Amino acid sequence: MKPRSSRDGHNAAAAAALLLAALVLSGDVLPAVVAGGAPSFNYKDALTKSIMFLEAQRSGKLPPTNRIKWRGDSGMEDGKLANVDLTGGYYDAGDNVKYGLPLAFTVTTLAWTAMAFEKELKAARELENVHAAIRWGTDYFLKAATKKDHLWVQVGDPNADHQCWVRPENMPTPRTLYQINDKTPGSEIAAETAAAMTASSMVFRKDKPYSRRLLNKAKLLFQFAKTHQGTYDGECPFYCSYSGYNDELLWAATWLYLATKRQVYADFIGHEAISSSVAEFSWDLKFPGAQVLLAELNMTSSGGLQSFKSQADNFVCAVLPDTPFHQVSITPGGMIHLRDGANSQYVTSTAFLFVAYSDILRRINQPVMCGAQAVQPARLLQFAKQQIDYLLGANPRGRSYVVGFGVNPPTQPHHRGASTPVLPPGYQVNCGMSFSEWFTPDRPNPNELTGAIMGGPDGGDNFSDKRGNSSCTEPCTYINSLSIGPLAALAIRGPNLIATQ
C-alpha cells in the first residue's frame, strides 16, 4: 500500500508555500437542478450517511446504539503490552491502525463543526450523533494522556498491518504501542490532541466535570508541546508532518484562548506563535483554520505586524480561481486538486472553511480582500457548494463519490472491514492468503461502507472504483469530519447557504 501522506513529494518549504497554479472550468454534469441551474441533492441523506461512516471506523467495544451491523468489537486488548487501557478511538482509514495525529484532527474538526453548525445539526436531528462521534475520540484521549509530559500516540504496527488484509475484529497483527514524552517529543501530536480536547471541552460545557477534565488535560498537553519542542517521526511514512509543529502550536493556543480567554494564550498567539499564509487546510497544516478563528477576534501576529484576517483572506484568494492571486489547481470538472491520494480531504476542508469563514465575515460585516479586489461572503458559499456537489455527483462522470449515496456510488472502497466478510469470532486468518481472498477479487465489497467519501478523482477528473487503487478509493475519517458542516448547512439553510442571523 502507498503511504497516506497528504503531502506526497513535498518538503517543508513547499508545504509553507502557496501551492500549484492552474485554470478552472465549471463542471458540466448536473444530475439534478433547481431554479437557476444549480445542482441539488438530498443533502440531509448525505449528512446522515457521512456521520455513519465515522461509526464504521470505531475501535473498541461498540455500544448498543451501533448502526453499522457488520462491525463488532475490536482492539479489545489495545494497551495491554504496557498494562494500560487504550481501547477505543478510531481507525483512520482502510487499515487497522490508530494514528494519533489524524485522529486528533478528526476530533478537533468535529468539535468545531458541532459549535459552528449547532443550529443546523440540531434541525437535522444529527447533533447527538456528532456529539457521540466526538466523545468516542475524547474518551480515548483521556486514556492516552494519563501522565504529565507523556502521550500514547499510536496503536498498531503499520508495516505488519499492511501485510494482512483482514477486518479489525479478527486481526492477528501486533498491537504495538508508540508514545511521546520529554525524551522523545512530538509537538505536532501533543498540540493537536490539546486542540481536540479543548474544542471538545467547549462542546461539552453542560457536562461540567467532563468538560473540565478535557480542558485540564489540554492545558498540560499544550505546555508539553511548547516546552519540549520536537517533531515526532514515528508515524512516518504514513503520517509525516512535513509542515512542522508551528501550525499546531498556533492552532492549540487559539482553541485554548477561545475556551479560557486567558491572556497567556493571547500573548503566545500575538507574540510567540509563527503564522504563515498557505493554501491548504489539512491534518498536517492548520494555519488557515486558526487564522479563520482569530479573524473574528481582530487579533494580530508578530507583535501586531500582521492581521490574522489578512492571512485568512490570503487562503481564500489562493483558492478562488477568479482572484488575481489564485494558485490552487482546479480540475477541468471544477474540483480542487492539490495532489493525488485522498485529494477529497482538500475538497471538504476548503468547503468547510469557506462556509465557516463566510459566516464570520457576515458577522463582522467585512469582505475578503484580495489586493484591491473585494470578495463577498456569498462567493465563498457558492464555491463551497460547488465542491461538495462535485463529490455528490455534479462532476464530469456524473457519479457519486460517496458510498451508498446518489448515482453509481463506489462499491470497492479500499477498506479491510468493508471488503472482508463477517468472520466467526476467533477465526484464524492466514495473512499470506488474505489478499488473494478479499483484496484482489474484482467484485463489490460484501459490506457497504455507508457514507464513506472516497479519496477521489485525480487531476484529470479520472476515477477508478477499484480496491487496489487506494489513492482513489481509500476513505479517511478527516475527509468526512470536514464534510459534515457544509452538508448540514446545505440541508437546513438551502442552496444559498446563508445563515439566519
Swiss-Prot record:
Keyword Hydrolase: yes
Residues that carry a glycan: N298, N462, N469
Active site residues per record: D95 (nucleophile), H414, D465, E474
A Gene Ontology biological process term: cellulose catabolic process
Protein location: Secreted
Main location: secreted
Gene Ontology molecular function: cellulase activity
UniProt cross-references to InterPro entries, sorted A to Z: 6-hairpin_glycosidase_sf, 6hp_glycosidase-like_sf, Glyco_hydro_9, Glyco_hydro_9_His_AS
Origin: domain of life: Eukaryota
Swiss-Prot/TrEMBL catalytic activity: Endohydrolysis of (1->4)-beta-D-glucosidic linkages in cellulose, lichenin and cereal beta-D-glucans
Pfam families the record matches: Glyco_hydro_9
The UniProt record lists the keyword Cell wall biogenesis/degradation: yes
Transmembrane spans: none
EC number: 3.2.1.4
Family: Belongs to the glycosyl hydrolase 9 (cellulase E) family.
Protein name, as recorded: Endoglucanase 8
Natural source organism: Oryza sativa subsp. japonica (Rice)
